[in-house]
Amino acid sequence: MLDLRNVAQNFDAVVARLKTRGGNLDLGPFQRLFAERRELYVSVESLAARRNAANEEMKRKAKEDPKALDALRGDLRAVSQEIKEKEARLKDVEEELNRILLLIPNVPHESVPEGGGAEDNVQVSIWGQKPDLLFAPKQHFELGEKLGMLDFERAAKVSGSRFTFYKGALARLERALVTFMIDVHTSKGYTELLPPYLVLRETMMGTGQLPKFEDDAFKTLGEPERFLIPTAEVPVTNYHADEILEGESLPIRYCAFSPSFRAEAGAAGKDTRGLIRQHQFHKVELVKFAHQEKSLDELEAMTDDACDILRRLGIHHRVMLLCTGDMGFAARKTYDIEVWLPGQNSYREISSCSDCGDFQARRAKIRYRAQRGDKPQLAHTLNGSGLAVGRTTIAILENYQREDGSVAIPEALVPYMGGLKELKPI
């Protein structure tokens, strides 16, 4: 959530930068309500001063002219009633301003290029080479079904579309990837968390999933209302909600494995086959809490930590700096890591790493003291996939496929696979 006073004091500049994100953004009501809020504050303060003066006058009159007290009491009641009415209206105005702020995305950082969509993203680095396959490569779902290790048909029977059963060695590969990723990240100073998969509404509000993206969430019907997490970012970021951290403890780094659940409300007709866009998928998430002036450096480090998984797996990839029109709601700066998929003959996102500034921390009330005894200030939060496990499985299937339909297992994963070096049809 943006800072109320900053939006009001720098309204034109904030609106201009937000408009580079695209979409329809009407902040006219914000200006009107903020002006009313200011007037109400002035009025309430003035009335409170009148009430205080009336109280003092009553004390004086009680000694000098007791007969005048009735008139003064009437005036005091009228002033008190007016204060009560204006304070009630002030509460309504502030609640409405808060509702507006909850729907406004983060302001892009000045280093983020302007643009309307993916075509305006900027490549900042590239690693490795595309595999030199001397045959027509297959897509991952063709390979998985031929291996007898991906079963979309039975999953549809059980759960409907956009689900799958992993089977045999491919199920083990997915599990091996999770352990491998966690091992790599914890070796770099990340602390592993195993989070809850169901969270409260205020938890989803804290990271910015709600209220704007409620249609893309799965939720329970009972009370209290709970949501299945769309990413471990949600519970892990809120791990420090309503807390004041000590500056010397920052940056705090967490990694967490979890299933992720998404309704994919706007994905009709997109990636209908395979593992790219599922209602349930696995992900290892990276989350950081940083000093305000150091979060951009932490974003660079986090992005490299995610890329390191792909380097160790020997998979060609590139890093893209997202333009203003392609960034997520809570992010002020984002790098997408895109992996090459020979079967699709295209790059596909396997990780998004974002610096959210104080946007989430303001919602979740996550603060820190730079020095002991200092006034608390909002922390900066960062998050990124390290990596999306299903999409990493896709990348292995397509990049390590052989002409006979078997798939080599990357050397780094062989110890996690009990020495197994290839996937062969069941």
UniProtKB/Swiss-Prot annotation:
Q: Which superkingdom is the protein from?
A: Bacteria
**According to its UniProt record, in which pathway does this protein act?**
Aminoacyl-tRNA biosynthesis; selenocysteinyl-tRNA(Sec) biosynthesis; L-seryl-tRNA(Sec) from L-serine and tRNA(Sec): step 1/1
The listed locations are: Cytoplasm
The UniProt keywords, alphabetically, are:
Aminoacyl-tRNA synthetase, ATP-binding, Cytoplasm, Ligase, Nucleotide-binding, Protein biosynthesis
Q: Which parts of the sequence bind L-serine? A: 231-233, 285, 385
Name the catalysed reactions.
tRNA(Ser) + L-serine + ATP = L-seryl-tRNA(Ser) + AMP + diphosphate + H(+); tRNA(Sec) + L-serine + ATP = L-seryl-tRNA(Sec) + AMP + diphosphate + H(+)
Q: Which HAMAP family match?
A: Ser_tRNA_synth_type1
Q: What is this protein called?
A: Serine--tRNA ligase
Gene name per UniProt: serS
